[in-house]
Amino acid sequence: MPRKLYSPKHSSNPYIKDFDEYKELYKQSIEDPSKFFKNLANENISWMEDFKTTFNNQFNNAKWFEGGKTNISLNCIDRHLENDPNKIALIWEGDDPADSKELTYKELHDEVCKFANVLKDLGVQKGSRVCIYMPMIIETAFAMLACTRIGAVHSVVFGGFSPESLKDRILDADCKIVITADEGLRGGKKVPLKSNVDEALLGCPDVKNTLVIKRTGGEINWDDKKDVWYEDLVKDVSNKCAPEPMDSEDPLFILYTSGSTGKPKGVLHTTAGYLLGAHISFKYLFGIRPEDKYWCTADVGWITGHTYILYGPLSNGATTLMFEGVPTYPSASRCWEICDKHDISIFYTAPTAIRALMAQGDDPVKKTKRDSLRILGTVGEPINPEAWDWYYSVVGKSNCEVIDTWWQTETGSVLISPIAGITPTKPGSATLPFFGVKPSLYDEHGNTLEGSNAGNLVIEQSWPSQIRSIYGDHQRMIDTYFGMYKDIYFTGDGARRDEDGYFWITGRVDDVLNVSGHRLGTAEIESALVLHPKIAEAAVVGFDHPIKGQGIYAFVTLMINESFDDNFSYELKQFVAKEIGAIAKPDLIQNAPGLPKTRSGKIMRRILRKIAENDLSNLGDTTTLADPSVVESLIENKQSL
């Protein structure tokens, strides 16, 4: 059934005249990307030294703007000081509605320089890896920007990850310093960040210092040899620190994302290409105006927080809001109260949050005005049309454009999305590709699927902000993204293209789940489950979840003579939360005396997905199973859940 087409509500985008101009610019970006991006890089980046070549023409070993030197912090802060030093750069909204502050670009400059000097005094230098395990407080922005200022490579780990997950990421990136807070605050509850770091560091002997920011003043353990208070060090440092000239391809940050194998991948992004992608996507897609106040609800522990809370908005000289809390605390009106309080004009959130707020009904929204809003964005997973319609009609009062963006940690910036004021939208569709992005649909044999069709979503040519490597394992990067289709980037997502050429993302086609907009590898969760002494084997699949998009469904086979009940199910969920983090806790755990396997021993996840989804009449061919009776017992056990 064709979806309704929504024409843009706002007839103008400051940077693109109309839909025809978008199509012409897009054509130029695909036909001659070197010329197109050379011009954009010169127009949008402040260079310390000009680049010599635009692109090296190697998709799986891409290098953009070689020979050039720049600095992210210079582009995000210093270049705005001459014309608008007193413009608000950051608005911080605390977990408690009474707690908020604003910083101008000049104040941000001073704080970032001081933080950079503290890091230098602790021995951090160009190329050092710095782990940041922080709540959403304003010092987190200082820490990230300070790393970029001195050329250190930050590795931000989401504050919801467990000590075990944190340890793995510290070791993989070989970080010598961890930046954390005494505790975090979320939804009125304290998060024991320093305590988690202490536990993680028991397995990280090479970490020299833990730099601790005081957030709650709660009691924490202290190691005089290793732990240092930020507040003690920052008193004695200068508020001046020159930005380090960085080669275009110098590493900028590592961000871990889940893979279909157990070990998380350290996605490596580099300086100039990432900066350009973040800058131009934010500028064009949101049609940013000088008076805009922008709020992305993500955590900086995810790529959305990197690109669209900090680097995209700040490089454009915009005003960006950081929120410490959760959308439903202290009430389900919180998001919309913040929009009214700070006159937010652009609001960017995940479908999971939209569905959770939608479940609270219209009243919490209608208690607020929301008159300042002009653009509503969505990110992290496909948005179902019902949630899109509610977002558009109830939150936006049918007067705001909805910008449904598709991209990944590995892409660095948005690849498929409407452009505000330009692209007609359809509820549930990410619509059309951004400049320089050449998406296509392939079948499993590598054949191109033309016209209105469905298949595996691939990108056929490089773009500036693409992944450069997996930290310490470039071959894994090639195998993961360029192995299925030679020299073509495989996204791991399925999509369909309609008769208008619009793309509709249908979800993961590999063994990665998208839970509340966060990617989790099934292998990682399975590995955590089988660490439990009572578990012999585990298989994890996704199922449709009304709020999270995908829920986590675990099938577990117990060791001999062990028994399964509700208490043990609860124990297992807590066990996984401790190993990985609460975000990976299974929603449902089913006792599985046996798992459906082929004669070669491969688990047939297709059948497990059908059982998890309760699609029992459509299990497909089970003749290749070593023991087809296993399926009957799984269905029987399913009924008792």
Swiss-Prot record:
Top-rank taxon, per record: Bacteria
UniProtKB keywords: Acetylation, ATP-binding, Ligase, Magnesium, Metal-binding, Nucleotide-binding
Enzyme class, spelled out: ligase
Gene Ontology MF, one: acetate-CoA ligase activity
Listed GO CC annotations: cytosol
Cofactor: Mg(2+)
Any single Pfam family the record assigns to this protein: ACAS_N
Gene3D superfamilies: 3.30.300.30, N-terminal domain of ligase-like (3.40.50.12780)
Keyword Isomerase belongs to the record: no
Keyword Nucleotide-binding: yes
Modifications the protein undergoes after translation, according to the UniProt entry: Acetylated. Deacetylation by the SIR2-homolog deacetylase activates the enzyme.
Residues where Mg(2+) binds: V530, H532, I535
BP GO annotations: acetyl-CoA biosynthetic process from acetate
Residue positions binding CoA: R186, G187, G188, K189, T304, S516
Cysteines engaged in disulfide bonds, as pairs: none
Matching CDD domains: ACS
Positions of post-translational N6-acetyllysine modification: K602
Catalytic activity: acetate + ATP + CoA = acetyl-CoA + AMP + diphosphate
EC number: 6.2.1.1
Sites where the protein binds ATP: G380, E381, P382, D404, T405, W406, W407, Q408, T409, D493, R508, R519
InterPro entries from the UniProt entry: Ac_CoA_lig, ACAS_N, AMP-bd_C, AMP-bd_C_sf, AMP-binding_CS, AMP-dep_synth/lig_dom, ANL_N_sf
Family: Belongs to the ATP-dependent AMP-binding enzyme family.
Main function: Catalyzes the conversion of acetate into acetyl-CoA (AcCoA), an essential intermediate at the junction of anabolic and catabolic pathways. AcsA undergoes a two-step reaction. In the first half reaction, AcsA combines acetate with ATP to form acetyl-adenylate (AcAMP) intermediate. In the second half reaction, it can then transfer the acetyl group from AcAMP to the sulfhydryl group of CoA, forming the product AcCoA.
Protein name per its UniProtKB record: Acetyl-coenzyme A synthetase
Organism encoding this protein: Gamma-proteobacterium EBAC31A08
